[in-house]
Amino acid sequence: MKKHTLFLFAALAPLTLVSCGENGNTITFAASELPHAKILNEALAPVLKEKGFDIKVTVLDWTQQNAAVARGEYDANYFQHEPYLNSYNADAGEGGALKMVVKAHFEKLCLYASNPQDKTLDNGDSIEIVNDISNIERALLLLKDNGVLSDISKNCYDKDGNFAEFDVNRPNDFVTFADDYSRCTITCIKESALAASLGDYDFGVLPGNTALKGLGDDYASRIVFGENVTEEVLSLRANGVAVRPADATNEKTKAIVEAFADQRVSSYIQKTFGESVVYHYENLLK
């Protein structure tokens, strides 16, 4: 498996969608707005054009994208990491399952302060995290690795060691806070509401794309700490492109996978996006 990793830096810029006639040479994508659709339109599109393909990108809510590709409404989507796709596939069954064909970038999970002038976590502060099972463990590990939590309940893990059991309505029953933060509390809410709700809490654990889109240009000034990004974490949590299994080796898919390896794509991401984004390429067709 081929891997390239490059740590990147970011600044927001306007999103421009590419539209073109839908035909055999047009690749249709469903994608999240930032950074995914922006990367597709501004970095991948010129590379794919050289390979004989135009692209059409539709920004969809992330909860709709897998089903839309499975129904054949789009050739591919670009928004998710492999653990989320695996969780979706387990529920979708064989007919609705998708296959990830390339990993392209990683979005660092960070703790953000609601008040950028006060980034000290005090005992009794409130913390919001995401409410989907594939990302809850990641948020809890971020807090544990940085000394906020001392333990995550073993009851959260199944016999194979997978994080599988967690009641989003009782998150504090599944964690133990470190002594210095014993009166802190965690609340689980929808990822789409994390940025808008940050003002209702003292701190929030937000994925990179959510912070980029929802916190504005000063998002970086709110960062308290971020994930320790190892090669293992990069590979596990890198966002990639998913297609229907039957399309995994067609010419469109091969072109997508090759295009993401182009130096111009990695350079674009490096120059365009902030410290919350990391370029990480893996060809999953090999």
What do the PLM-derived regions correspond to, one by one?
Residues N135-N146, A259-Y281:
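Periplasmic-binding protein-like
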Residues A97-S150, S266:
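A conserved helix-loop-strand patch within extracytoplasmic ligand-binding domains
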Residues G24-L34, F53-T58, D125-I127:
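Short, well-ordered beta-strand elements
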Residues E33-K56, Q64, Y74:
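Short, polar/charged alpha-helical segment
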Residues S87-V101, S114-Q117, D200, G214-V229:
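Ligand-binding "clamshell"
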Residues K108-K119, L236-A255:
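A bilobed periplasmic-binding-protein/Venus flytrap-type ligand-binding module shared by bacterial periplasmic
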Residues L15-S19:
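C-terminal motif of bacterial Sec signal peptides marking the signal peptidase cleavage site
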Residues V57-A67, K159-A196:
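Short helix-initiation/N-cap motifs at beta->coil->alpha
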